[in-house]
Swiss-Prot record:
Expressed at highest levels in nurse cells of the ovary. One of its GO terms (cellular component) is FACT complex. The lineage of its organism: Eukaryota, Metazoa, Ecdysozoa, Arthropoda, Hexapoda. Residues 531-557 have a biased composition (Basic residues). Component of the FACT complex, a general chromatin factor that acts to reorganize nucleosomes. The FACT complex is involved in multiple processes that require DNA as a template such as mRNA elongation, DNA replication and DNA repair. During transcription elongation the FACT complex acts as a histone chaperone that both destabilizes and restores nucleosomal structure. GO terms for biological process: DNA repair; DNA replication; follicle cell of egg chamber development; negative regulation of protein phosphorylation; positive regulation of actin filament polymerization; regulation of chromatin organization. This is FACT complex subunit Ssrp1. Component of the FACT complex, a stable heterodimer of dre4/spt16 and Ssrp. Interacts with CHD1 and TRL/GAGA. Residues 644-656 have a biased composition (Polar residues). It comes from the Eukaryota. Residues 464-478, 486-507, 664-676, 702-723 have a biased composition (Acidic residues). It comes from Drosophila melanogaster.
Length: 723
């Protein structure tokens, strides 16, 4: 016989819900550990009174009845385990595993039998159903009725609220059967009543969740939170764990109680009670027990009078009454010298405490993570430029908890702690293959041809060439633009009306005023607009003839291996993919080229073609009017078009400058120069009739030039098509 049996996927019944966990059976005890809450229940071998097997839906299970009258039910065993389990129970606990027969006739009348803390409703010798009395929260009697109310489990999708029993009156009975039924139920029911004297009372205790100040009254089986608005009664057996944690500034203490089931405030459930204490607050309480009761009932763990800081006194009383040890922060010490690591969880800031067997976060919302729940941890966003990092915890059920904004100084301490606890870190360099299976993961491979990328590069080169041509035009037209030479700082500072003076002086009639100045301003604005439009048109015209003329004698460029292969397989691609678009052939060919393993034939041919190109280029001499000459000639012609005339340069050598709109013919230039030499005048005269005629002639000649350019470009396109 084996010393123990262990099952990893067994369900235990907890208030109408089957909770999964691990069951271990040894000669000394039966241990069940809840997977979700981590709560451990132990049944000593000496306390076992009866063990039966029972059929459940789709499986079978065990009924373990203790001498104290408590019933435990475990389900999820395979049929093949029945014989093996029966032999182990007989050898370890000296019990015969007899099957419990159930009545399935559907009758709703029978006999109520009380066995320990279980109400069994039987018909003849078979059980119809069983009610654990520890699940009963209230029992109310009527004339011939008894109503049982039950504690609710939030994890249960459907719960039993109440059950009514009709008990017929018996005249010959000495006792009323209704009262007797009520007494049997109440003797074993988990009814919370605040009758009797409390063991200890703590006044005005600050609680962070649920927020408020409450008076805490501690009784033997439960404790009560009494606030201004809400009142809670919490059974001692619903407390899973106790935590005593110091605040980061060491001026406060957190006392945390983990609850299952949680308390409810409206629709909000609180799985943790977070109490906040000041370390310097002290109290003294006297327990209402004699020395003999303290020694017999609590094994001498409590004294008659307890004094000290409030959190220590409450923690000591809770620890003994609940029967759970208090968990501290452990050996971890952070950069701040305390066990707390400042961080943010979800939308609120709080503190993360690395414990000996898990993590706990306080306080909004509180969260406890056990090591056995953790799949991996990750240090995220911890680059050199950032001053903080994120700590991600991934659970085995797929849930990810992210603690963000942790100071960079905590990284080394936290990493050493993770290494010491042997937790799996997911970003150590081995797991950086996140994009391996993505289709676009190898798109940056320069050895593979990409038709779309080549087209984009060609367009970018053409655009750069056009931009260079445009920039040279703009630079050449703006060579004479010297605004600082046209203004007089002294005149602007000391003249009362600089613009009106200059306008009056330049007016031939000599009758300038406010209205005349406004008109001239409008004329100048319109002239500036015309100038901008003209520049824009000139830029468009200069871009058109930028096309290069091909040199027919220039050697043909070398063809790549991909293009050689594509030219040979183009027809086969069309046959295999009927109806394929011309634009899709290159894309399909690129995919086939990537899958092609043996490319040596095409690569050798491409190498020969490349050598041929280099040899021909060595002996090649450009023809007159070829690419290089055309290119230079095109740019020089553009510069000649926009090059300023000598008369303009002579005009700009004075105290001010003149733009194109104000340049007149030779007759008016001398008069303008004389006027420019006068120190009080800063702006030139409006354009004369001669200027207008000159502009008209120039504008008529420009369309002719553009037509010639367009004809030349059309001829180039025809040459390219013929090639």
């Amino acid at each position: 016989m084996t010393d123990s049996l262990e099952y990893n996927d067994i369900n235990a019944e907890v208030r109408g819900v089957l909770c999964s966990g691990r069951l271990k059976m040894t000669e000394q005890n039966i241990i069940f550990k809840n997977t979700k809450t981590g709560k451990v229940e132990q049944i000593s071998a000496e306390d076992i009174d009866l063990i039966n097997s029972q059929k459940f839906v789709g499986t079978w299970g065990l009924r373990v009845f203790t001498k104290g009258g408590v019933l435990h039910r475990f389900t999820g065993f395979r049929d093949s385990e029945h014989e093996k389990l029966g032999k182990f129970i007989k050898a370890a606990y000296s019990q015969e595993m007899v099957e419990k027969e159930m009545c399935v006739k559907g009758w709703n009348w029978g006999t109520a039998r009380f066995m320990g803390s279980v109400l069994s409703f039987d018909k003849e010798s078979k059980t119809i159903f069983e009610v654990p009395l520890s699940h009963v929260s209230q029992c109310v009697t009527g004339k011939n009725e008894v109503t049982l109310e039950f504690h609710q489990n939030d994890d249960a999708p459907v719960g039993l609220l109440e059950m009514r029993f009709h008990i017929p009156a018996v005249e010959s009975a000495e006792e009323d059967p209704v009262d007797k039924f009520h007494q049997n139920v109440m003797s074993k029911a988990s009814v919370i009543s605040a009758s009797g004297e409390s063991i200890a009372i703590f006044r005005e205790i600050q609680i962070l969740t649920p927020r408020g100040r409450y008076d805490i009254k501690i009784f033997s089986t439960f404790f009560q939170l009494h606030g201004k608005t809400f009142d809670y009664k919490i059974p001692m057996d619903s407390v899973l764990r106790l935590f005593m944690l110091p605040h980061k500034d060491s001026r406060q203490m957190f006392f945390v109680l983990s609850l299952d089931p949680p308390i409810k405030q409206g629709q909000t459930r609180y799985h943790y009670l977070v109490l906040l204490f000041a370390p310097d607050e002290e109290t003294t309480i006297e327990l209402p027990f004699s020395e003999a009761e303290l020694r017999d009932k609590y094994e001498g763990k409590l004294e008659k009078e307890i004094s000290g800081p409030v959190y220590e006194v409450m923690g000591k009383v809770m620890k003994v009454l609940i029967g759970r040890k208090i968990t501290g922060p452990g050996n971890f010490i952070g950069h701040s010298g305390t066990a707390a690591v400042g961080c943010s969880f979800k939308a609120a800031a709080g503190y993360l405490y690395p414990l000996e067997r898990g993590f706990i976060y306080i306080h909004k919302p509180p969260l406890h993570i056990r090591f056995e729940e953790i799949s991996s941890v990750n240090f995220a966003r911890s680059g050199g430029s950032t001053r903080s990092f994120d700590f991600e915890v991934t659970l085995k059920n797929g849930t990810v908890h992210i603690f963000s904004s942790i100071e960079k100084e905590e990284y080394a301490k936290l990493f050493d702690y993770i290494t010491q606890k042997k937790l799996h870190v997911s970003n150590m360099g081995k797991d950086k293959s996140g994009y391996k299976d993505v289709d676009f993961g190898d798109s940056d491979n320069e050895n593979e041809p990409d038709a779309y990328l080549a087209r984009l590069k060609a367009e970018a080169r053409e655009k750069e060439e056009d931009d260079d041509d445009g920039d040279s035009d703009e630079e050449s037209t703006d060579e004479d633009f010297k605004p600082n030479e046209n203004e007089s700082d002294v005149a602007e500072e000391y003249d009362s009306n600089v613009e009106s003076d200059s306008d009056d002086d330049s007016d031939a009639s000599g009758g300038g005023g406010d209205s005349d100045g406004a008109k001239k301003k409008k004329e100048k604005k319109s002239e500036k607009k015309e100038k901008k439009e003209k520049k824009h048109k000139e830029k468009e015209r200069t871009k058109k003839p930028s096309k290069k003329k091909k040199d027919s004698g220039k050697p043909k460029r070398a063809t790549t291996a991909f293009m050689l292969w594509l030219n040979d397989t183009r027809e086969s691609i069309k046959r295999e993919n009927p109806g394929i678009k011309v634009t899709e052939i290159a894309k399909k060919g690129g995919e086939m080229w990537k899958e092609l393993k043996d490319k040596s034939k095409w690569e050798d041919a491409a190498a020969k073609d490349k050598q041929r190109y280099h040899d021909e280029m060595r002996n090649y001499k450009p023809e007159a009017g070829g690419d290089s000459d055309n290119e230079k000639g095109g740019k020089s012609s553009k510069k000649r078009k926009t090059e300023p005339s000598p008369s303009k340069k002579a005009n700009t050598s004075g105290s001010g400058f003149k733009s194109k709109e104000y340049i007149s013919d030779d007759d008016s230039t001398s008069s303008d120069d004389e006027k420019d030499n006068e120190p009080a005048k800063k702006k030139s005269k409006p354009p004369s009739d001669g200027d207008a005629k000159k502009k008209k002639a120039k504008s008529e000649s420009e369309p002719e030039e553009s037509e010639e350019d367009s004809n030349a470009s059309d001829e180039d396109e025809e040459d390219e098509a013929s090639d």
